[in-house]
Amino acid sequence: MSLKGKSAIITGGSRGIGRAIAIMLAKEGVDVAFTYVKSSIEAENLKSEIEKQGVQSLALQIDVRDFDKTKELVEKTKLAFGQLDILVNNAGITKDMALMFMTKDDWQSVIDTNLNGLFNVTRNAIVTFLKQKSGNIVNITSISGITGMARQTNYASSKAGIIGFTKSLAKETAAYNIRVNAVAPGFIETDMVSSLKEEYKNELKKVIPLGRFGTAEEVANTTRFLLSDESNFITGQTIVVDGGLSIR
């Protein structure tokens, strides 16, 4: 898929979808820098897994809500790999509850991580992409940002914002050979879904036309396609990976 020799930043890369994307890109010959927040053990395990593919890896414990730290992320990646070609904005959190019980902090913390964090990283990376007149960005959003979900006003708002951000930045940077797209997963077999009650998971599967949850690797496959030359004429789009759940 013509990715060999490129370098990437993946935020929220140490587990779930981010981890799957990191490993898949490494297998394509991409040097991978990724961020994590808590588990240094998970981060070191992923770093080792990436390096087994014969590429370089950089694990950085960074809070994407901190603008200056995300600037350091870009600088350290370029220093380690000599270049930056790809950005995957995957870092995100949830604090699901009915709006009437949601505190200002419950709202703000989700917006700060999911949307403001994405701005911070992209704002610092875009300078490099504009100077070199090339770059590829994939933002991980959610079907919650497309269809809305009960008890997710904070999360859905942040993810809908990512879709608007993606479209606007794609229009803004297309003339500089920069592509910006988004991937919107549905229910994927990650820690977030695994924590749901079994009876609720069974009910969810009944309303998914393909009858199952997706895998992190399936989301990674879509991301890899959008980062490859095979999607060179695609920008500003949101690709849904949800087993048909959002079909209307």
Predicted regions located by residue number:
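Residue(s) in the substrate-gating loop at a strand-loop-helix junction
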Residues: 142
